[in-house]
Amino acid sequence: MTWTFLSHHAHVLILLAKNPEETIDQLAFACGITSRSIVSILNDLEAEGYIARQRVGRNNRYSINQDGPLRHPTSFHHTVGDLIEALGSFGDA
């Protein structure tokens, strides 16, 4: 497979919508990328206000800003919530 329809950032958001307590290693395995790449993506998403990170013991819990606009010029009128709703409802496994 040489390309996909969704970016790794989108995959991470969808996975976090399904399980906000997913670990970096679990996200990396599910996305097929390195843990270091996941950390970079999480930092990007947090810096832009798409997710918030809360420390719970030794782990993090992530909440998603569903109202955050998509970034591409052709889809900026849609939100992160729209994307997640279209591809997998919040909390669905």
Q: Predicted segments — roles?
A:
Residues 26-29, 46-47:
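Alpha-helical residues within the helix-turn-helix
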Residues 15-19:
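Short amphipathic alpha-helical elements of helix-turn-helix/winged-helix folds
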Residues 10-14:
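Pre-recognition alpha-helix immediately N-terminal to the DNA-recognition helix
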Residues 69-93:
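Amphipathic alpha-helical dimerization/coiled-coil segments
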Residues 36:
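Key DNA-contact positions within bacterial/archaeal DNA-binding proteins
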Residues 40, 44:
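Alpha-helical DNA-recognition elements
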Residues 46-56:
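A short, conserved structural fragment
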Residues 2-9, 23, 55-76:
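Short, cationic-aromatic polyanion-contact patches
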